[in-house]
């Protein structure tokens, strides 16, 4: 049987028929094998995993996804993408390969540890706060080098300040130490990010939630050449 897929209306009708057909049959509660105490989907050879997806050979993972690289990871919470022998990762994205004790980090990798609010820090870096693009560095705050003793004192002062005078966004939401970066600081519109793929919002919904929205620019290019047949 053939279907005409050139019409959006027809395509939506076909999708509804397919979904109605699927609902007539039992659905497996979880895709996975050799697990103990897990919830979510596509979980394999893991233990104590809660509400997570695409996890493999890992233990004590909560609210995480795409943690599939081997060897597995453990003791991670709100962690998206990668893993590979990662431990104690919290609210971080695209981090992995022997990383440990990361909080609020993005794209930090290759045996880094004890990092907070960092981006693109790699190759064995440790004890960094609010740093970008450092390699084999330690005891830095906002990319500035400190001694071990100075670092400990400054971190204590910074966290105290973040709690006493927190960032407050346009919607009145309070961001103390321990919160991820506010969405309104993102240079991208909600509709330009992967968030729109997983949690779709229309423009009004996004703006109501305090997100940015970017209207696509019109690109009516004039064809100025022809291909001779």
Language-model features and meaning:
Residues 1-229:
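Long, distal/terminal scaffolding or interaction modules
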């Amino acid at each position: 049987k053939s279907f005409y897929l050139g019409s959006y209306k027809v395509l939506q009708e076909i999708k509804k028929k397919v979904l109605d057909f699927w609902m007539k049959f039992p659905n497996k509660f979880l895709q996975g094998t050799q697990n103990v105490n897990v919830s979510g989907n596509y979980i394999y050879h893991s233990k104590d995993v809660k509400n997570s997806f695409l996890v493999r050979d890992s233990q004590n993972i909560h609210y995480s996804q795409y943690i599939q690289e081997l060897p597995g990871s453990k003791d991670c919470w709100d962690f998206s993408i990668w893993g590979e022998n990662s431990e104690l990762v919290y609210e971080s994205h695209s981090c992995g390969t022997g990383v440990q004790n990361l909080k609020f980090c993005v794209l930090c990798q290759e045996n880094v540890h004890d990092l907070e609010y960092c981006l693109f820090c790699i190759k064995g870096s440790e004890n960094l706060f609010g740093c970008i693009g450092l390699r084999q560095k330690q005891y830095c705050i906002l990319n500035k080098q400190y001694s071990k003793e100075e670092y400990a004192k400054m971190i204590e002062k910074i966290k105290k300040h973040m709690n006493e005078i927190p960032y407050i966004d346009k919607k009145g939401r309070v961001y103390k130490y321990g919160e991820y970066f506010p969405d309104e600081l993102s240079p991208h519109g909600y509709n330009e990010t992967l968030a729109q793929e997983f949690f779709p919002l229309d423009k009004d919904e996004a703006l109501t939630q305090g997100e940015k929205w970017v209207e696509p620019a019109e690109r009516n290019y004039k064809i100025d050449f022809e291909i001779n047949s």
